[in-house]
Amino acid sequence: MKSRSRAVYSINPSVDIYKIGEDQVEFYFITTRRRILLDISPTLILALTFVDGRRTLDDIGQIMAIDSQELAPFFDYLLGQRVLLDIEEEIQDLSLLAKVDLDRYDRQINYFRSAYSGGAFSQTKLLEAKVVIFGLGAIGSGIALQLAMAGVRHFILIDGANMMSSSQERHYIFSHAEIGRAKVDIVAEHLSQIDPLISSVLYKEYILPDTDLGKFLADANFIINTLDEPYIGFTSAKIGRVCVQKNLPLFVAGGFDAHLMSTGELIIPGKTPCVDCYLSHFTTTLAGWKPRYNIPPIERELYEVKGRDIDFHVGGLASMALFSISYATITIIDYIVSQGDVKTVYGRGECLFEDLNINYLNVQRDPKCPICSVI
């Protein structure tokens, strides 16, 4: 990235600058908490005071009575670190969005400007994304709401269940008036209320062993699975294997069963462990483990009749679900906006309620995995 002598620069409004002594400056990104500490000359420190969004590099050089090219390497560096913004490039970037979207996503664009290349350009990646969500329970519906607020406008929603009274404890879309209605319909209506430009394709059906997933994934570029019927391991394996074949990123969301503050995991074909790598890991680490449930026997019929409330549920809080929802959404947004250039993938972790620390599993790609080892 080369400075142009006639280019006009401004300081990123999300960056605070602190002078430390005579030859040190710290740049602090308010939004991302990133810090850059530099040992620089008093001349370069002085040059920063003339950056106002109107002066060119030549103008600053003339004011300081020095050759502007002496400042160029320093300005190039700050431009690359997003401390400085090129006004012309910013105008071009903002032209990518309609004014209504610039106004709506103003704060988000400011955040993206510090974290990625081009604030408005980053926002367009969300507006263009086509996201599939399997399962619209507390976690799946919550992720849908947050993605809609962030700017995703194309959803494919799959869930065969109806809203039940038990949903009131954790579902952020719950209303007593909605009990008995299909979750896909309820979620789609909420999304449209957030943004009338959102389009949702709805499938009120369960995922069975013989279900063909092709119709759900045909036009998608990001897949989310929160479907825990019959159980999350089965649905994730079935969906995950197809995602590897189609080179589609998959997020298996947390918040299920006894893992109500799970981070979930981002699965990128060829880069991270796949679902089968996780299954292999658990097969090894949990070998011989047999849980004992201290609850009285419950008639089998209660579990076999879909749509009925069941007397026993693993305990949890709506706020615990919100943690899993928000962690998943941030990870998904990062993948979409960075166009897959994710710097760090932490894998599955769990936030412990007592001390709020997150413990991550050390799951590696299995070199003998029958699904992803050939990638």
Regions found by a protein language model. Name each.
Residues 1-375:
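Adenine nucleotide-associated cytosolic modules
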